[in-house]
Amino acid sequence: MIPKLKYLLSLAILGIPVALLAAEDPNLPKAEETEYYSPVPPIITANEGQAPSDAVVLFDGTNLNAWEPVKAGSKGWEIVDKALTVIPKSGYMKTKAAFGDMQLHIEFREPKPIGDKKGQSRGNSGIFMMGLYELQVLDSYNNTTYVNGQAGSIYKQHPPLVNACRPPEVWQTYDVIFIAPRFASDGSLISPARETVLHNGVLIQYDVVLKGPTEYRGYPKYKAHAAKLPIQLQDHGDRVAYRNIWVREITLPQSK
């Protein structure tokens, strides 16, 4: 046996961590040289079931002050039992504020199926990051459709890793990390949008690369747009409800 390997095995048998040898190696830098103390991460409060203290609360069940209808002349959606509820044919709703890189928490509830509706006709809605990139909302509980259009899909681009849907009329959650695309001054794409999604606490999308804004027909293609744009919620004709909506703007860390 090689002498050094025999020595290390002897240390392991004696219960002496091999990592301690690093502290005895004069050729390695001091431990302090690989430690830094700034910038200090800000302290936030993150209590169970509540929005973090640095979050922007978009809907808490009491008012629609953070929202407005997209369609001109529309009265928008309504609040029913503290839930923001779609009024069919009223059009999309959008946030008054604009967002780019963000962490989004949103809860939704699918309505009870009516008649023999199936596929895309059951509880259809959507959450559009920047008003352009759709995370599908659909009743996909015992309801089949094309996989890149089921609940949790990045619509027509990425199917979810798993189907984590709950039955209709039961509240569900999406937790989203969205990184906006970057464009050069000439409008060319520097980096595409990326997205990670947890559905009811289960990872269903992991840092997927978006091919461009959502398209129902045709293929997605990037076109330069603002660094921040409003979030939109889709009216697709079904009485989908939303609650507890908050967002945290993200500042990406700079590598050391």
What is each of the regions a protein language model found here?
Residues 1-12:
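Bacterial N-terminal signal peptides that target proteins for export
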Residues 17-18:
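N-terminal signal peptide c-region/cleavage motif recognized by signal peptidases
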Residues 22-256:
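Carbohydrate-interacting regions of secretory-pathway proteins
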